[in-house]
A protein has these predicted regions:
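Conserved tyrosine-mediated DNA breakage-rejoining catalytic core shared by Y-recombinases
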Residues: 8, 17-54
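Short pre-functional
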Residues: 1-13, 122-123
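The alpha-helix within a helix-turn-helix
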Residues: 5, 16, 135
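Major-groove DNA-contacting interfaces characterized by cationic-aromatic clusters
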Residues: 50-99
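Catalytic-site neighborhood detector that most strongly recognizes the C-terminal catalytic loop/helix
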Residues: 34-36, 138-163
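Short, polar N-cap/turn motifs at the start of nucleic acid-interacting alpha helices
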Residues: 21-27, 110, 126-148
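Short, basic (Lys/Arg/His-rich) helix/loop patches that form interaction surfaces
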Residues: 78-136
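Conserved catalytic core of the tyrosine transesterase superfamily
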Residues: 1-3, 23-25, 35-37, 69, ...
Length: 165
């Protein structure tokens, strides 16, 4: 299910409730829950080869999680990430009680269901997909908010834009 999130760019509340009837012509057709309040906006996501392989593995029926199971889902994902060796130390800054504080954690501790969405946006951007197109799939309405999702470290940025120098 985590990989489906990475392949679709959807929120947990959406990728955890995908049903077989949401698939048409090798596309996922879904109305994200968050946008229902703002007017139903269907999102159509072409299925990647990886997405199709996962669907085939489960005969078109993906596991479903209720919103109440999000904490459990995140715990399982973190355990998997720890077990596969995502134990690098990462340092970042966080606003705590109005102060900017340097935080050090192990990489797996920061992985969650929301990592899927950030991964989707970052990978599509690195492949050269225009930001406006990615936003259509991810449901972002403001480029400012979308750009916060991109996780481009210095090395990835240099790799992506090397041709400009």
């Amino acid at each position: 299910l985590f990989l489906i999130g990475c392949e679709s760019g959807l929120r947990f509340s959406d990728y955890s409730r995908i049903q077989p009837h949401d698939f048409m012509r090798e596309e996922l057709h879904i109305v994200p829950k968050k946008t229902k309040k703002q007017g139903a906006k269907k999102v159509i996501i072409p299925l990647s080869d990886r997405f199709k392989r996962i669907l085939n593995k489960y005969n078109g029926v993906l596991p479903n999680y209720e919103r109440s199971q999000l904490t459990r889902f995140n715990k399982i994902i973190r355990e998997i990430c720890q077990n596969v060796g995502m134990n690098d130390e990462i340092k970042f800054y966080r606003e705590i009680a109005g102060k900017t504080v340097k935080v050090t954690k192990l990489k797996y501790e920061e992985v969650s269901s929301h990592t899927c969405r950030r991964t989707f946006c970052t990978l599509k951007f690195l492949k050269g997909m225009p930001a406006q197109a990615i936003m259509k799939f991810s449901g972002h309405t403001s480029e400012r908010n979308f750009l916060k999702y991109l996780k481009l470290d210095a090395e990835l940025t240099a790799q992506k834009y090397r041709g400009y120098f």
